[in-house]
């Protein structure tokens, strides 16, 4: 009986480890021992061995769907109602569907190119940066072939920027929501105090938003000291449940409190559209989980079907919540729809707590990418006894950088748009079509494929340039927000109890 239980327990442990491993983004195994890639070509690297799974060890179709949903649903979803405001009630949803279709198509492109290059270079799997590097090697242009290693570095750079940007967004999100919950609790105490002692009313006070960010800093540092994602399995499961419950409560609120939407603008001003683009691309930037999931799927031939179904669900969720959220709150919509929920009802206050818990746990998962790209190259230069101390120091430093970024730009909507325009557009829209051109230019040249890919990449480049320009301009010269009873000011008032500062 005991012998029979042991394999079952081992199998359960293996499945748990797989569930966490597929959440690892596309990290490429790098050689820090001075050997070349050619010397390693016939050897399976540790990461490659990890992906050589038989049918019993791989993940199922349903598990693949679940991981696709986990990899795409986060703070970007809650910021989409404001994105619809920046585009218009008609143009916004149409554009959101369009960007979703292009993003999914680029995911398919990346998978197809990875398969071709794996066969060409006899590799079991390839990460994102290696796919770009090998695509440059097989291109017909010698100048790109000589700079193939440069392509790998560019992708790694944007992966680091993107993921650290996500982490900065998470810190702003945590601070905004916890601040609102805390102030709602204090206001309820003030109301009770005033009702019992009307002759001595209590003064409303508000703590600076950046103080909340600093309060989260030590807890986040301790969280990222957990180096193995499998050790976060329980927390990750609870985070997924809490975020799912929060979304259900948000949906029922916006559906039950829908005012007349006829006065909403069909199309917003052109200057706000780049902000919409950045937020939308930020939300759809789940390309980092595509190849790991495909590599670990039992029936990898069914992955395109899983990708279409999963991203179809994600797109439907995005469009419905974004549209309903904007229709519900109109121009009062904020950087996260959770901030528009009533502060005097604890059911909706609990939504902010539950979703904040989910985002807090997700921080460590997103942080895994820059940590695995940056840390090995630095710690390899230290003696063994100093490596762990050095690693913890680097982790603390990187977390502090994300916190500093959040403090410098404490506006959730602007941070999301900036990260989406700068790095997410590069990884999700610009690089995949260019990689397809390079990969198949010698095999089956097709002028329509080239035109299609150039159009997608051009869209990404335009969004990158305009989105970056508009968000930087908004950071330097923020649009004034008029609050009842206060004069119009071009400066942000982070101490505003109404939380209108830092949010549009």
Swiss-Prot record:
Q: Name one GO biological process term.
A: proline transport
InterPro entries xrefs: AA_transpt_TM
Where do the record's glycosylation annotations fall on this chain? Answer: 495
Position of the signal peptide: none
As its record notes, the protein acts as a catalyst of: L-tryptophan(in) = L-tryptophan(out); L-alanine(in) = L-alanine(out); L-proline(in) = L-proline(out)
What membrane topology was assigned to this protein in its record? Multi-pass membrane protein
One Pfam family assigned to this protein is Aa_trans
Keyword Transmembrane helix on entry: yes
**Protein role:** Uniporter that mediates the transport of neutral amino acids like L-tryptophan, proline and alanine. The transport activity is sodium ions-independent, electroneutral and therefore functions via facilitated diffusion.
- This protein's name: Neutral amino acid uniporter 4
Per the UniProt record, the source organism is Homo sapiens
